[in-house]
């Protein structure tokens, strides 16, 4: 079962790569066509927008009133997918905006945190399905080639992306123009891309795009390293600077060993008591000297040892 799941995932990735290559080839062909002298009409553009584009590209002079009326009719009858803005936007995803940036009240639509594949070699941005079907619906006619969506960034620059549906991965993607947007804005995995539109009825057909960097939690200057507490070279009974003042000072090791050796020597050098023949461990015979001290001698040894330890403890 795991092998089947892995193989299906790899097959989907291969299909996405093939579709990405096909999209890149289509982009190159379209760029060559756009480089020609004759202007080409975008399929989903309205008639007023096409007339405005044709009039702006014609060599003959056109009166300002006719141009203004064409622009007004375009904004009045424009669809939510903004196809042309008349500001010289390039069809491959970038163009110089006007010098005066108009302040427009925006309505936030959704955010997308880009993944490594979104900024990788596939040259596509996957749009979540719920947001794609809500804000960028596709009909059967536009599903074959997709739509060209125009967005404005924070500087007023226009960006045009091809928006389509991939049947292999069953996902909505933006392909054409996205790679240039990634390169210019230097997007990386974890960055957030925001999509907005005009809040007023007159600007509802205008789309906006914005981005923000991810918060780097591995910033070395964010958390400072705390100093470690200093340790004393002496032990708790060594009498050094780190020793506790409430505990008694331990005498030198040589003094205690000497006192214990003296106590042991005095205990072993005392005469041993005689034991009778009733001892089971000693051999039978009169006058046998036992190797064990009697209870009096044992008590004397304990007293001597305790007094020796007290003397050594009181010593400075």
Curated annotation (Swiss-Prot):
Q: What are the recorded GO MF terms, alphabetically? A: DNA binding; DNA-binding transcription factor activity
Q: Which UniProt keywords apply?
A: DNA-binding, Nucleus, Transcription, Transcription regulation
Organism in which the protein naturally occurs: Oryza sativa subsp. japonica
Compartments (UniProt record): Nucleus
Protein name listed in UniProt: B3 domain-containing protein Os04g0581400
Q: Where is the composition biased (Low complexity)?
A: 46-77, 253-270
Regions of compositional bias (Gly residues) in chain numbering? 88-98
InterPro entries in UniProt: B3_DNA-bd, DNA-bd_pseudobarrel_sf, LEC2-like
GO cellular component term of the entry, any: nucleus
Q: What is the lineage of its organism?
A: Eukaryota, Viridiplantae, Streptophyta, Embryophyta, Tracheophyta
Q: Which parts of this chain does the entry mark as a DNA-binding region?
A: 110-215
Q: Does the keyword DNA damage apply?
A: no
